[in-house]
Protein backbone atom coordinates (compact mmCIF):
# COMPACT_ATOMS: atom_id res chain seq x y z
CA UNK A 1 0.00 0.00 0.00
CA UNK A 2 2.84 2.41 0.78
CA UNK A 3 4.22 2.21 -2.75
CA UNK A 4 1.03 1.71 -4.78
CA UNK A 5 0.42 5.46 -5.10
CA UNK A 6 4.08 6.06 -5.87
CA UNK A 7 3.89 3.40 -8.59
CA UNK A 8 0.86 5.09 -10.12
CA UNK A 9 2.81 8.37 -10.03
CA UNK A 10 5.54 6.65 -12.08
CA UNK A 11 2.95 5.68 -14.67
CA UNK A 12 1.88 9.33 -14.87
CA UNK A 13 5.23 9.91 -16.58
CA UNK A 14 3.63 8.44 -19.69
CA UNK A 15 1.62 11.64 -20.05
CA UNK A 16 4.97 13.45 -20.30
CA UNK A 17 5.96 11.32 -23.27
CA UNK A 18 7.86 8.57 -21.48
CA UNK A 19 7.26 4.89 -22.13
CA UNK A 20 6.85 3.01 -18.83
CA UNK A 21 6.95 -0.79 -18.60
CA UNK A 22 6.72 -3.03 -15.56
CA UNK A 23 9.46 -5.65 -15.85
CA UNK A 24 11.43 -8.01 -13.65
CA UNK A 25 14.79 -6.70 -12.53
CA UNK A 26 17.45 -8.12 -14.87
CA UNK A 27 19.84 -9.17 -12.08
CA UNK A 28 19.45 -11.91 -9.45
CA UNK A 29 20.07 -9.85 -6.34
CA UNK A 30 20.55 -12.89 -4.11
CA UNK A 31 23.71 -13.84 -6.02
CA UNK A 32 25.12 -10.32 -6.29
CA UNK A 33 24.13 -9.62 -2.69
CA UNK A 34 26.34 -12.45 -1.46
CA UNK A 35 29.21 -11.20 -3.61
CA UNK A 36 28.82 -7.65 -2.31
CA UNK A 37 28.70 -8.92 1.29
CA UNK A 38 31.96 -10.81 0.78
CA UNK A 39 33.65 -7.70 -0.62
CA UNK A 40 32.24 -5.39 2.06
CA UNK A 41 33.35 -7.80 4.78
CA UNK A 42 36.86 -7.82 3.32
CA UNK A 43 37.05 -4.02 3.21
CA UNK A 44 35.59 -3.82 6.71
CA UNK A 45 38.35 -6.10 7.99
CA UNK A 46 40.95 -4.06 6.12
CA UNK A 47 39.80 -0.89 7.94
CA UNK A 48 39.02 -2.35 11.35
CA UNK A 49 42.05 -4.65 11.37
CA UNK A 50 44.37 -1.75 10.55
CA UNK A 51 42.91 0.35 13.37
CA UNK A 52 43.08 -2.56 15.81
CA UNK A 53 46.80 -2.93 15.06
CA UNK A 54 47.33 0.82 15.54
CA UNK A 55 45.63 0.56 18.95
CA UNK A 56 47.43 -2.71 19.75
CA UNK A 57 44.08 -4.43 20.33
CA UNK A 58 42.86 -7.88 19.38
CA UNK A 59 40.02 -7.65 16.89
CA UNK A 60 37.51 -8.91 19.49
CA UNK A 61 38.39 -6.02 21.83
CA UNK A 62 37.70 -3.26 19.30
CA UNK A 63 35.00 -0.87 20.53
CA UNK A 64 32.69 -1.37 17.52
CA UNK A 65 29.16 -2.61 16.88
CA UNK A 66 28.58 -6.37 16.96
CA UNK A 67 27.55 -6.37 13.30
CA UNK A 68 30.72 -4.52 12.24
CA UNK A 69 32.87 -6.94 14.24
CA UNK A 70 31.13 -9.92 12.64
CA UNK A 71 31.71 -8.44 9.18
CA UNK A 72 35.38 -7.82 9.97
CA UNK A 73 35.82 -11.41 11.18
CA UNK A 74 34.24 -12.75 8.01
CA UNK A 75 36.47 -10.49 5.95
CA UNK A 76 39.53 -11.67 7.84
CA UNK A 77 38.89 -15.23 6.68
CA UNK A 78 38.02 -14.42 3.06
CA UNK A 79 40.52 -15.94 0.67
CA UNK A 80 41.92 -14.06 -2.29
CA UNK A 81 40.14 -16.50 -4.60
CA UNK A 82 36.79 -15.88 -2.88
CA UNK A 83 37.33 -12.13 -3.12
CA UNK A 84 38.18 -12.31 -6.84
CA UNK A 85 35.15 -14.57 -7.43
CA UNK A 86 32.96 -11.97 -5.72
CA UNK A 87 34.42 -9.16 -7.81
CA UNK A 88 33.93 -11.20 -10.99
CA UNK A 89 30.29 -11.76 -10.02
CA UNK A 90 29.78 -7.99 -9.85
CA UNK A 91 31.60 -7.46 -13.15
CA UNK A 92 29.24 -9.98 -14.74
CA UNK A 93 26.26 -8.12 -13.24
CA UNK A 94 27.66 -4.85 -14.62
CA UNK A 95 27.87 -6.43 -18.07
CA UNK A 96 24.32 -7.80 -17.82
CA UNK A 97 23.09 -4.35 -16.88
CA UNK A 98 24.94 -2.78 -19.81
CA UNK A 99 23.06 -5.19 -22.10
CA UNK A 100 19.80 -4.31 -20.34
CA UNK A 101 20.38 -0.59 -20.83
CA UNK A 102 20.64 -1.09 -24.59
CA UNK A 103 16.84 -1.41 -24.47
CA UNK A 104 15.89 0.72 -21.43
CA UNK A 105 17.04 4.16 -20.27
CA UNK A 106 16.37 3.82 -16.55
CA UNK A 107 15.10 1.46 -13.89
CA UNK A 108 12.65 3.00 -11.44
CA UNK A 109 12.17 1.11 -8.19
CA UNK A 110 11.40 1.83 -4.51
CA UNK A 111 14.24 3.29 -2.47
CA UNK A 112 13.19 1.19 0.54
CA UNK A 113 10.99 -1.88 0.67
CA UNK A 114 8.86 -0.67 3.59
CA UNK A 115 8.04 2.42 5.60
CA UNK A 116 10.87 3.88 7.71
CA UNK A 117 11.59 1.65 10.69
CA UNK A 118 11.41 2.77 14.27
CA UNK A 119 14.74 3.59 15.90
CA UNK A 120 16.26 0.39 17.25
CA UNK A 121 14.50 -1.96 14.80
CA UNK A 122 17.81 -2.41 12.99
CA UNK A 123 20.08 -3.01 15.97
CA UNK A 124 23.75 -3.06 14.95
CA UNK A 125 24.56 -4.61 18.33
CA UNK A 126 22.02 -7.40 18.05
CA UNK A 127 23.24 -10.76 19.29
CA UNK A 128 21.25 -12.38 16.47
CA UNK A 129 23.28 -11.36 13.44
CA UNK A 130 21.15 -13.47 11.09
CA UNK A 131 18.13 -11.43 12.09
CA UNK A 132 20.10 -8.20 11.72
CA UNK A 133 21.34 -9.20 8.26
CA UNK A 134 17.89 -10.35 7.20
CA UNK A 135 16.30 -7.12 8.35
CA UNK A 136 18.95 -5.01 6.66
CA UNK A 137 18.65 -6.88 3.37
CA UNK A 138 14.84 -6.94 3.41
CA UNK A 139 14.65 -3.23 4.20
CA UNK A 140 17.23 -1.79 1.84
CA UNK A 141 15.86 -3.44 -1.27
CA UNK A 142 17.82 -3.21 -4.47
CA UNK A 143 19.64 0.05 -3.68
CA UNK A 144 22.88 -1.77 -2.84
CA UNK A 145 22.94 -3.38 -6.29
CA UNK A 146 23.15 0.04 -7.94
CA UNK A 147 26.01 0.95 -5.62
CA UNK A 148 27.83 -2.35 -6.07
CA UNK A 149 27.69 -2.22 -9.87
CA UNK A 150 28.47 1.48 -10.26
CA UNK A 151 25.09 2.47 -11.66
CA UNK A 152 24.32 6.18 -11.18
CA UNK A 153 21.13 6.56 -9.15
CA UNK A 154 19.08 9.27 -7.55
CA UNK A 155 16.33 9.07 -4.98
CA UNK A 156 13.33 11.17 -6.00
CA UNK A 157 10.27 11.83 -3.81
CA UNK A 158 7.34 10.51 -5.87
CA UNK A 159 4.46 10.48 -3.43
CA UNK A 160 3.49 11.56 0.07
CA UNK A 161 1.91 8.88 2.26
CA UNK A 162 0.25 9.33 5.63
CA UNK A 163 1.33 10.90 7.92
CA UNK A 164 3.15 13.30 5.61
CA UNK A 165 5.78 10.68 4.71
CA UNK A 166 7.64 11.18 1.42
CA UNK A 167 7.97 7.95 -0.56
CA UNK A 168 10.98 7.83 -2.83
CA UNK A 169 11.68 6.12 -6.11
CA UNK A 170 15.21 5.22 -7.12
CA UNK A 171 15.99 6.20 -10.71
CA UNK A 172 18.98 4.18 -11.93
CA UNK A 173 20.74 4.56 -15.29
CA UNK A 174 23.51 2.73 -17.10
CA UNK A 175 27.08 2.93 -15.85
CA UNK A 176 28.40 6.29 -17.04
CA UNK A 177 24.88 7.50 -17.80
CA UNK A 178 24.75 10.16 -15.12
CA UNK A 179 23.20 12.66 -17.54
CA UNK A 180 20.33 10.32 -18.51
Regions picked out by a protein language model, each given a short descriptive name:
Residues 39-98, 110, 114, 155-165:
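Short helix-loop capping/hinge segments that flank enzyme active sites or metal/cofactor-binding pockets
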Amino acid sequence: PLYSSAASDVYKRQSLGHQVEEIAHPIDHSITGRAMSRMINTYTYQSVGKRAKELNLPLDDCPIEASTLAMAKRGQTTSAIAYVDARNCLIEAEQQLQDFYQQYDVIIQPVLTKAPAKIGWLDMNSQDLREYGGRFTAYSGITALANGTGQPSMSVPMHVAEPNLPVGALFTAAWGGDAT
